[in-house]
Each structure stands twice: as C-alpha cells, then as structure tokens.
Amino acid sequence: MESQQLSNYPHISHGSACASVTSKEVHTNQDPLDVSASKIQEYDKASTKANSQQTTTPASSAVPENPHHASPQPASVPPPQNGPYPQQCMMTQNQANPSGWSFYGHPSMIPYTPYQMSPMYFPPGPQSQFPQYPSSVGTPLSTPSPESGNTFTDSSSADSDMTSTKKYVRPPPMLTSPNDFPNWVKTYIKFLQNSNLGGIIPTVNGKPVRPITDDELTFLYNTFQIFAPSQFLPTWVKDILSVDYTDIMKILSKSIEKMQSDTQEANDIVTLANLQYNGSTPADAFETKVTNIIDRLNNNGIHINNKVACQLIMRGLSGEYKFLRYTRHRHLNMTVAELFLDIHAIYEEQQGSRNSKPNYRRNPSDEKNDSRSYTNTTKPKVIARNPQKTNNSKSKTARAHNVSTSNNSPSTDNDSISKSTTEPIQLNNKHDLHLRPETY
C-alpha cells in the first residue's frame, strides 16, 4: 500500500521521507539497522500521515527552506582521481608552460611543482630535504643576490641536527631582454653550482666533468624553461633549440665559449692600447703580435681601421723609432703594412750598424798615440811634431844665440842648420807659404 503511494508521488514522498529521517535525532549509540518490527510500523504510520498532509497543501504555497532537507537536484559527483598523485597536485597545460614555451614543444607533466627540486641534489641524510624558493622568485636581473642565500646545509650538520633551519638556494632571476642573456646565464650557472650540479657544467673543452643523468637533464630543461622565456632568448639560442628543444647543455657550452671570447676581446683591446716597442725584439715578432690582435678583434665584430691601428702603434714607439710619429702623422691614408715597412727599415739599419762595429779590444797605447796626433779638417796642411822635441827643447834665448853665431861664421850654409841640436819643423807646404823664425 505504502509502496504504491510512493510510486504515485515520487518527488513528494522522497522529500517527506528524507525530512522525517533527517529531523530525527539519535541520542544513543544503537545501531540504526537494529530496529524492531513495532518501530517500523510506527515509522510507516508517521510517513502515511505526512503524505496525507502534503496532499492538502496548495501547490502555489511557498515552502520554507529547511537546511536539513535534501536538495531535489542530483548531487555533483567528484571525478575519479586517477594515478598516484592527487588531482590538485597535477600540473595543467598552462602550468607546464608558464613562460609560453610553445617554441620548445610540449614539456613533460612533472608531478612536482616548478619551484621544487629533487632530493638527489642535496647531501644524503635520513630525512628528505626539499629546498623551496623564497619570495624573491622571478625577481628582475638587476636585483642583487645575497651571498648568504647561495649555500647549502652541510651534510655533517644535517646528519647531526635535523631540526636546524635549512638554507635556501636563491634561484636565477627572470630573463627580460635578449641583451641581458650573457649576464643571466652567469647567474644560472651559479645557481647550478649552488645546487650541487657543478660537475655537469661544460668546461673549457665543452665537455662536463661527469656524465649527466636523465633526472638532471630534466631539471636543467625545466629550470631553464621557467626562468628564460622564449621571447627574450637571443637568436643563436633559438637556433639551437629549434634542432633540439632539450639541448640545454649545448647552450651552456656556447655561452661559456662566448664568455671566454669576451674576455679575450677585452685583453686584446688593453694590449693594443698599451703597445711598446723600442727595437729590443725582432720587428717580425712585433708585427705578428699586432696583426693577430687586430685580426681577432675584426673577426669578433670589433673593427679596427688603419688610422686607429697606426695611431696606437706609433704611440708606443720609442728610441730611434719615435721619429716615425712625426714623419707619418700627416699621411691620412697610411696603412699598418706601410708603417711596419718603416719599422723594419730602422730595425735592419740597427742590426747592420751593430754587425759592422769591431768586436776586438783596443790597446791603451794606441789610444794614447791617437790623442797626440790630429788632423786639421779645415786646412790641407798637416803638422807633425817630433815627440823628442819636448825632452830636448832649450830656452828661446839659447836658440837665438845659436842662430846668430851661425850667421857670423864664413862657412855658414844650410848644413850648419841641419847640424844644430834643434831640428827645424818640417812643413808640407803646398801653397808656398813662408813662416817667420819667431813663429817657431
């Protein structure tokens, strides 16, 4: 009987039944299924009475809302949670591509959040350590990084005191411009070193110290994807990723090569600006050094024209090469090759003069004899004095007395002069010059 009434009024009977059941309050711990037959009859009578009252109620009357009444609409059933991870922890497609990396394809759905690292990058210990990024995640590149935040918890302290406060690893800043990529990649490499991944960073020869694992490669890809948006990457980085969007190691290797190239460029510019040459080294070696520096700078995009190169070279010349500054300063179209021709000419002249000089040592007596004789370059007449004259010289009055006595004697001739103790001065007179006796 009751079942027929419930079938005739399914909605009303369902609501009435729920209202009667939910309005009851159970004050005991008795099992609700353990009910006697008399109790069941009482419930049936109460239900029949409630149904009769519902039939007399007008359809247009408003029924007050009872919070204990069940909703007549079907309840929404939550979708099943498939897999070992809860639904709220799974990453959506937008979360998987936080930086708009459509250029790199579809990254894998990692089960952990982008700001959480695997425990394999930390010192071993009985407790899993998951470093979490502080509130400075995503700061611009100009934000300074504190030194205190770039360290890890020591393994010994982690084993001894597991309740100590963990130190966080500051993540790299967000890349905001292609021009900032060289500076950004330095902070990213520092971030990998602080994450105990310094062994996978490529060295000078382009190879890492140790092989990289698949988990580490995934970590590189995910962190590079998060902090380096594709729209701010340089063209050469996009070219690498267009071939393999996971080849982050090649990007790091090329970045390190560019860092070394930039350092070499700075060294070449400093060397070229501080050139010094005085002929102490061969001119060929000096020319090779300068031309190699200029060629490297030109190949790296720093063009050094002939005018600037010649000015830098001439500014460093000294010694006998210094006059090249003044002989060539008016030549506007002078090339580096022409300047080195002049340098080679001076260097060869220096070497020739050094080879022509005698290498033996002169005797002191030769130097003494040379000091006593000299050649008069203004007059063709050469005067040679007798070295014994200084030892046997007489006074002027004695010589005059000898001359007067020789003139008074009848047998005086030119032979008497030759027999005198004082020898006359021998002159090589080519111009028929006569000297008075008083002059000698």
Curated annotation (Swiss-Prot):
Modification sites for Phosphoserine: S416
Highest taxon, organism lineage: Eukaryota
Biased composition range(s): Basic and acidic residues: 429-440
Positions with biased composition (Polar residues): 1-10, 48-60, 127-152, 419-428
Keyword Lipid metabolism tagged: no
Entry function: Capsid protein (CA) is the structural component of the virus-like particle (VLP), forming the shell that encapsulates the retrotransposons dimeric RNA genome. The particles are assembled from trimer-clustered units and there are holes in the capsid shells that allow for the diffusion of macromolecules. CA also has nucleocapsid-like chaperone activity, promoting primer tRNA(i)-Met annealing to the multipartite primer-binding site (PBS), dimerization of Ty1 RNA and initiation of reverse transcription.
Subunit text: Homotrimer.
Protein name: Transposon Ty1-OR Gag polyprotein
Organism whose genome encodes this protein: Saccharomyces cerevisiae (strain ATCC 204508 / S288c) (Baker's yeast)
